[in-house]
Amino acid sequence: MAENMLDASNVGIAKGREGGYACVAPAGTDPTTFIDMKKTLADFCKEPSAVLKSLGYISEDGVTITTDTDTDDKTDWSGVTIVSPMTSYSEGVEVTFLEARDTVLKTVYGDANVTSDNKGTTTVRHNKNFTGAHLFIFDAVVSDTKVKRVVIPNGVITERDDQEMNNSDLAGYTPTIKCLPSDFFDGDCMREYIYDTTTVAA
């Protein structure tokens, strides 16, 4: 059977998947545990031995995956570039978490910088001590029948964006997550899994 030259089922606008948009787990957690696309992130979080914790709502801007590369152009005698070897490669994620829940605060600012008392007050210390590495997972619906899961086994927050507090925008926390190579994924920084739900259901 000939391949379709055009297939609209592969086209869509990414939106958060029902059952949880994003979760976090301690560094060293085996990411292959969370590849079963029949399960939502909520399903994983409800398991008796669950290590995943929800990061709650994400802003309407969604999740941005960035790729940065550097190359070193090598020229011949006349100045013409003949080879351009890559000298560095990195990937990152930019996202705004909207909830001021403990999981978000501790992920962005570090466990030692977030404390809660028995009177309902949470204190968040702002300092140069960033949090360590975590496993991050993001779930999205990318078409009528397809869902995408992005798994980052070794994500380190390296930046915290400005906080906006005004009467028009939702307040949130916007970290930059640097995705480091992972032995779990044979040196890959992240992997994305795209599943056709009609196939999975079958």
Where are these regions (language model features)?
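Short helix-loop boundary/capping segments
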Residues: 102-153
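A glycine-rich, hydrophobic loop/mini-helix early in the fold
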Residues: 44-96
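Beta-strand-rich interaction surfaces with strong enrichment in secreted/lumenal proteins
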Residues: 80-83, 138-140, 163-165
